[in-house]
Amino acid sequence: MKEESSAVSNLVFDFLSESASAKSKDDVLLLFGKISQYFGFSYFAISGIPSPIERIDSYFVLGNWSVGWFDRYRENNYVHADPIVHLSKTCDHAFVWSEALRDQKLDRQSRRVMDEAREFKLIDGFSVPLHTAAGFQSIVSFGAEKVELSTCDRSALYLMAAYAHSLLRAQIGNDASRKIQALPMITTREREIIHWCAAGKTAIEIATILGRSHRTIQNVILNIQRKLNVVNTPQMIAESFRLRIIR
């Protein structure tokens, strides 16, 4: 188990390092494809989530979904009937499709989406909902015929998905001067706490290490998240790597 954890940790840091040098969406596509295959996935997609009156076309960022499936999904406007997308709007934790939908009663249209996805070997998957503090919603999904992920694998995929999404949003913005001006002011103590979070420590553990109260550490973490416009710790770590706050 320790060797597995070490291997996954090395994979994550290699991915973060190589992604930092990515010059285009194609570079990210290649790297993300390798990560997907490592964890047993055949397909992946990164997309924003449109409002109820919008279509997905302009929100889709990157992916290798089967052309046949994506065309059908887009033409039938399945995004608003997709139970995975619906679930991602209401939670901020990653989930395996089969586990999350196990006790769900799907309506006819939602069941149709999942049944038709199976025709393209999208039988199960793993999705990472991503929300910004400003309310923008996105989702990163991995698809396969079968999903087998350890807790360590899930955490790693969450972090890499959040990082890739953040990186792609920055590339789409493509305004270096604005990004430099918008770089948040992070204190030495905040940077230290981000490092501990990236090392897998909980707020309680960090409080013990630094000799501070649990509430104090929680408040610092929440303040960092506000500065980075993210809503949870994995996104905070990913954005900190992208902005070179930590390396």
From Swiss-Prot:
- Residue range(s) of DNA binding per entry: 203-222
Identify the PROSITE patterns for this entry.
Answer: HTH_LUXR_1, HTH_LUXR_2
Annotated HTH luxR-type domain residues? 179-244
Does the entry feature the keyword Nucleotide-binding, yes or no? no
Q: Which GO terms describe its biological process?
A: regulation of DNA-templated transcription
Keywords (alphabetical) are:
Activator, DNA-binding, Plasmid, Transcription, Transcription regulation
CDD domains hit by this protein = LuxR_C_like
What this protein is reported to do is described as:
Positive regulator of the rhiABC operon.
This chain belongs to the protein called: Regulatory protein RhiR
